Amino acid sequence: MKGLRDFDMETAYEAMRKSATLPGKENLMRPDNDDYMSKGYVPLMEQFDNSVSHALEYYIADYALYTLAKSMGKKEDADLFYKRSMGYKHYYCKEFGTLRPILPDGKFYSPFDPLQGQNFEPSPGFHEGNSWNYTFYVPHDVKGLARLMGGQKKFIDKLQMVFDKGYYDPANEPDIAYPYLFSYFKGKIGRAHV
């Protein structure tokens, strides 16, 4: 939100809202929107679909819609989009400390290898990457993700490990901001990998 208001805000907002709430069969922007709206996540329907990747994009978009709705005084919509934007937590798997695909029955996909998908090989739930390329892809709730991971120290250590083990791959957009995530935490900006 940069405060730009020199256009028809209501029409623009309604178009954005429509793309976020239209059922999947009719929705070219969010083809798997039915499950997303009803379950809060996109389940893995086929071995190499992009369910987690799609959902993460929706969460980020919904957070942007929350911000816009809130600025326009649309409290009910703001509440809806904020709640939806926090759905990334469904995918967090404590066993691996990463995001992990979820099956239609709500259980985690198994067997799971968070490294599957390196070098753009097919990966269940992730587009052109693996779980490590997407686990920190929650730019709208970095501190919330840190809490989910067990706190700031665990978050920082896990993020550092991504660099130390060579899991960081700037060739794919989801982890392109990883080097800067350290700066969200007081006293850690010096660890930013720039």
Model-derived regions, located:
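Active-site core of glycosidic bond-cleaving carbohydrate-active enzymes
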Residues: G3-M86, H90-R191
